[in-house]
């Protein structure tokens, strides 16, 4: 009887550890980085949110989103091991020693590219960051930019206002993420018309986005890399990106089609 009782107790105690081992929680913040992470009305979506859901179907463990947190708290939770994944950041963005010692990095998932945009007919030669010396560049308040030591910032409160600033010639150029630009033009009809007033130039800066894995779950690095390779190879990743960066074509009303053929 005692042996049976002890066995039951052992199983009950071991069950939470088994559940924990079969689940990886990933960090989510309550600040948007469109179109990579979109936090709106308490709901989370975006390219990287969809990527994590796609990877969940490829792995034997369950990937579970944490409750959205302020960015610094999300990093604290990772450092403490309360979340075990962060998708997706460049290695250079997490150089704090306390973060470095608990971080393992996946293979690159995708690149994030910042491009320079110009008012129409006002492009200037650009080959390196030093070419921005003395220029006025439209930026978003609170964002960091490679090469900012060379140019004078003209801050806007958000990316929509930034596009307007460039279109109206209030700065000589602007710097914006390439996919963010495509997303804004595809999903915001109120600014889509401004595309003709903006000329896209070359890439200014490129970051390699990887999944950060907590060192306590090192055994998951190889399966994670294999899953990333699969969603890249089978087109899943490309389809996710297109979902957020290509305009949705309006579907014609069948009755309208038939009446127009009469």
Model feature map: region roles:
Residues 21-97, 155:
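Extracytoplasmic small-molecule ligand-binding "clamshell" domains
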Residues 30-32, 110-115, 189-225, 248-262:
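Periplasmic-binding protein-like
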Residues 31-34, 42-55, 118-157, 162, ...:
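Bilobed "Venus flytrap"/periplasmic-binding protein-like clamshell domains
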Residues 46-58, 120-123, 135-136, 210-244:
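Extended ligand-binding regions for polar small-molecule ligands
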Residues 62, 143-153, 228-262:
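Ligand-binding clefts/hinges and TM-proximal coupling segments of bilobed small-molecule sensing domains
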Residues 66-131, 144-145, 202-203:
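Acidic, polar ligand-binding/catalytic clefts
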Residues 67, 72-85, 160-183, 187-188:
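Short helices/loops that flank or line small-molecule/ion binding pockets
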Residues 88-99, 173-205:
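A ligand-binding cleft/hinge motif common to bilobed small-molecule-binding domains
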């Amino acid at each position: 009887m005692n042996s049976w009782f002890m066995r039951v107790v052992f199983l009950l105690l071991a069950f939470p550890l088994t559940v924990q081992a079969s689940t990886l929680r990933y960090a989510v913040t309550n600040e948007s980085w469109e179109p990579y992470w979109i936090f709106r009305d308490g709901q989370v979506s975006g390219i990287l949110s969809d990527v994590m859901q796609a990877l969940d179907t490829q792995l034997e463990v369950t990937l579970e989103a944490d409750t959205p947190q302020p960015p610094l708290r999300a990093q604290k939770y990772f450092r403490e091991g309360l979340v075990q994944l962060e998708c997706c950041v460049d290695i250079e963005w997490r150089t704090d020693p306390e973060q470095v010692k608990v971080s393992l990095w996946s293979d690159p998932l995708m690149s994030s590219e910042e491009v320079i945009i110009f008012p129409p007919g006002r492009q200037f030669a650009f080959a390196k960051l030093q070419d921005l010396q003395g220029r006025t560049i439209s930026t978003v308040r609170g964002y960091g930019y490679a090469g900012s030591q060379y140019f004078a910032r003209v801050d806007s409160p958000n990316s929509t206002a930034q596009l307007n600033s460039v279109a109206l010639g209030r700065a000589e150029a602007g710097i914006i993420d390439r996919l963010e630009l495509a997303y804004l033009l595809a999903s915001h009809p109120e600014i889509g018309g401004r595309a003709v007033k903006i000329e896209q130039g070359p890439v200014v800066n490129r970051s390699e986005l990887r999944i950060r894995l907590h060192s306590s779950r090192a055994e998951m690095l190889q399966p994670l890399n294999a899953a990333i390779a699969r969603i890249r190879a089978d087109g899943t990743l490309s389809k996710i990106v297109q979902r957020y960066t290509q305009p949705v074509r309006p579907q014609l009303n069948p009755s309208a089609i038939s009446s127009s053929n009469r």
